[in-house]
């Protein structure tokens, strides 16, 4: 006997009721994406670790602390995907999809991060992911943000979220800003948290994303990135804001927003909520024009975002309409074949049907009631002989002796 039959810490079973909610969220989001021209694709859950190291940066929290990476039996370093974008870009390059640009791609599935489990944050969780490859110009940023807003509206949570927006500018802007930021932070080097002291040498902009109270006090007076934007970067961001205003999208500019991954440039954004405590981010993303060059020496303008399905499910209790099955109960073994024929014909008419031939009839009826079913069909000797059925409506407790055609009419 196995001593511990619990799932791994930070990983949960998705039971049928959970899956109904997940599928509802996925289908709603997918349908909105289809209206924008997005097509679904998937990549393997496992990739070579170098794919994520190269894309996300060694100094990112995901790579330095959270990635599930190990050596397989062929001595390859492989990893469970911690996000979708790296795998999508790898697939884009390895499948030679450059001639198909622009591409709008939707993916969904589990991702994995070794993090401290808490409400809204698990080590295995599920995401909705949208990537727009070949997305050039601020207008595509605006369209992507409109897609995100429309998805949140379809899921009935848009009013409970706030769009926080920032511009990281171009690479020239960030180089100048990073120098100024390091100069400022060096004056507080001894006061920074241990983690930020390491980041100061590797990726100082990531300190702006620190959750440490000590760091936050220091960051409060740090230089502002937008003050060092080139004219090109300023023009790009101003154009985006103009489009958002035209589209009626409300936003709040957060000059400290940098996102947690190294591949972003220009536009970065988060949709946050007050309903989930510390796990405030529901949907987030940004522009990553340099990522395809980092991976495969190709220049592809791109923007995308991901949303956490578990967090969306925590925000709203969805009243999902579930079609209840019809239960067919044969009375006596000699009527099982007739019952199987009835079930088969019901399914041919797209009616969810379950046959339950085992056990005493009272216990079988109780199982039906436990499933909150609405209808039972009894098949006994008399019904078989007369080629009809005993149909019971559990809501009004009425029984009818009718043929299959009449049953089909009642169930449609």
UniProtKB/Swiss-Prot annotation:
SUPFAM superfamilies: Class II aaRS ABD-related, Class II aaRS and biotin synthetases. It catalyses: tRNA(His) + L-histidine + ATP = L-histidyl-tRNA(His) + AMP + diphosphate + H(+). One of its GO terms (biological process) is histidyl-tRNA aminoacylation. GO terms for cellular component: cytoplasm. It comes from the Bacteria. Its EC number is 6.1.1.21. It is found in: Cytoplasm. One of its GO terms (molecular function) is ATP binding. Its main location: cytoplasm. The keyword GTP-binding does not apply. NCBIfam families: hisS. Belongs to the class-II aminoacyl-tRNA synthetase family. PANTHER family: HISTIDINE--TRNA LIGASE, MITOCHONDRIAL-RELATED, HISTIDYL-TRNA SYNTHETASE. HAMAP family: His_tRNA_synth. This is Histidine--tRNA ligase. The lineage of its organism: Bacteria, Pseudomonadati, Pseudomonadota, Alphaproteobacteria, Rickettsiales.
């Amino acid at each position: 006997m196995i001593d511990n039959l619990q799932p791994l810490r930070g990983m949960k079973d998705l039971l049928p009721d959970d899956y109904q909610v997940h599928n509802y969220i996925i289908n709603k989001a997918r349908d909105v994406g289809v209206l924008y021209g997005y097509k679904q694709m998937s990549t393997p859950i496992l990739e070579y670790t170098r794919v994520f190291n190269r894309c996300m940066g060694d100094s990112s929290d995901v790579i330095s602390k959270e990635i599930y990476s190990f050596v397989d039996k062929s001595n390859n370093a492989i990893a469970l995907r911690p996000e979708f974008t790296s795998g999508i870009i790898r697939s884009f390059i390895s499948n030679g999809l450059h001639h198909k640009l622009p591409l709008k791609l939707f993916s969904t599935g589990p991702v994995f991060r070794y993090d401290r489990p808490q409400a809204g944050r698990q080590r295995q969780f599920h995401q909705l992911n949208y990537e727009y490859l070949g997305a050039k110009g601020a207008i595509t940023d605006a369209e992507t943000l409109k897609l995100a807003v429309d998805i949140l509206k379809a899921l009935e949570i848009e009013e409970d979220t706030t769009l926080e927006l920032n511009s990281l500018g171009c690479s020239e802007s960030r180089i100048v800003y990073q120098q100024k930021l390091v100069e400022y932070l060096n004056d507080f080097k001894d006061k920074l948290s241990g983690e930020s002291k390491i980041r100061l040498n590797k990726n100082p902009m990531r300190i702006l994303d620190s959750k440490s109270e000590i760091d936050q006090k220091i960051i409060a007076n740090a230089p502002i990135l937008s003050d060092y934007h080139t004219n090109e970067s300023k023009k790009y961001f101003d154009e985006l804001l103009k489009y958002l205003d035209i589209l009626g999208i409300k936003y709040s500019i957060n000059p400290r927003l940098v996102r947690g991954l190294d591949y972003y440039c220009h536009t970065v954004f988060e949709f946050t909520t007050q309903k989930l405590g510390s796990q405030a981010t529901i949907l987030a993303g940004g522009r990553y024009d340099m990522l395809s060059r980092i991976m495969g020496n190709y220049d592809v303008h791109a923007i995308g975002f991901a949303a956490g399905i578990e967090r969306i499910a925590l925000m709203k209790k969805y009243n999902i309409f579930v079609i209840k099955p019809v239960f067919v109960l044969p009375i006596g073994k000699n009527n099982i074949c007739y019952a199987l024929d009835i079930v088969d014909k019901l399914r041919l008419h797209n009616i969810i049907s379950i046959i339950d031939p085992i056990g005493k009839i009272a216990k079988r009826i109780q199982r039906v009631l436990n499933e909150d079913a609405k209808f039972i069909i009894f098949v006994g000797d008399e019904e078989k002989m007369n080629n009809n059925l005993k149909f019971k409506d559990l809501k009004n407790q009425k029984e009818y002796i009718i043929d299959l055609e009449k049953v089909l009419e009642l169930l449609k």
